[in-house]
Amino acid sequence: MRDQKITRRRLLASGGAAATAALAGCAGGFENFGGSGAGDEGSSESQQATASGIDESDGAATVGMVYALGGLDDRSFNDAANRGIQRARLDDGVEYTNHEPTSVAGFGQIQAELASSANPSYDLICCIGFLQAEGLSETASEYTDQQFMIVDSVVEADNVASYVFREHEGSFQAGNLAGLLTTRDVDLGAGATNPEETTVGFIGGLDQPLIHKFEAGFRAGVEYANADVDVLTEYLGNFDDVQGARDIAARMYNDGADIVYHAAGGAGVGIFQAAQAHGRYAIGVDSDQSRSNPRYADVVLASMVKRVNVAVYDAATATVADNLPAGEVVSLGLDSDGVGIVYGTSLEPAIPDDVREALSTSREQVAAGDIVVPTERSNTGGA
């Protein structure tokens, strides 16, 4: 890195769109998510996607997308971010390039490459995932005239807009659902519950504080539904080992779990495979995974959706309007529809009316602050 701070002339488009609405208003309830929308990327860490046809003379703004480990076509977290920038392109004419680092060390390198680029010159660089925070802290301080946004972490800098989600709140809903259904006789699609076991599971990707929020919320939701339900927990160590996730899920199903919730990114496909093989159920994450992974819709009871797409869309369109909330933290939870539960497309009929009502009630209680969901495992009986 250079010793001196670097600034460069911003090329903000004139005649931009009007200021974007608040995220809560933009959300308007959970949407039906489509496919991954991912492009066919090269293997190089800094490979730029050309699908957006970068032409700064035509685009309202130019955005560089730096995705989390695992890259596009994960049918989960990264693909949700990709849908957001695609929508910004359709609605506001935003141009963008895609970048898929394959290591944590690659994040800062790509961030700096984009920030120093003159062709194209980026109006906004979107950093998807908490592992980008360390690199971005350094990059943002060096390129002080460059605007950034980050998802899932807070970087304290005047040129960074930080979007964070209260995943523990959405995971509480997932746990409440699992805790209620594991005690019932559910037999639909390719799975079934075993009410005599009353055991559920959680599989995380990296054993990190952010993923602990998923586990903590899930455990709290299960306990809220039924304190006698056992929760099995294991961490994969990454977000892309499909076979590893399948093996862990298989052990959990063999140990009596009939529903497994995951926060393991693209590796979650392995959990769905194990659910089909063992005739059990799963709960997806980040996107409606019964839609993004339709071949597993017969075992995906629901998904805990994070509106990463809306965060990216909001940041991109705010950049067009020259009102990016740089230097601020935008926190999204159940109260703003930033997170929530969507039932699976095939298995929605399996959800009893009283269970739906229970989840609707708990959602209102969490949103109102009547139920305070823990963010740490130590507060829920976890490790």
Segments predicted by a language model, with ranges:
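Terminal disorder- and signal-encoded targeting elements
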Residues: M1-Q146, I150-S162, E169, Q173, ...
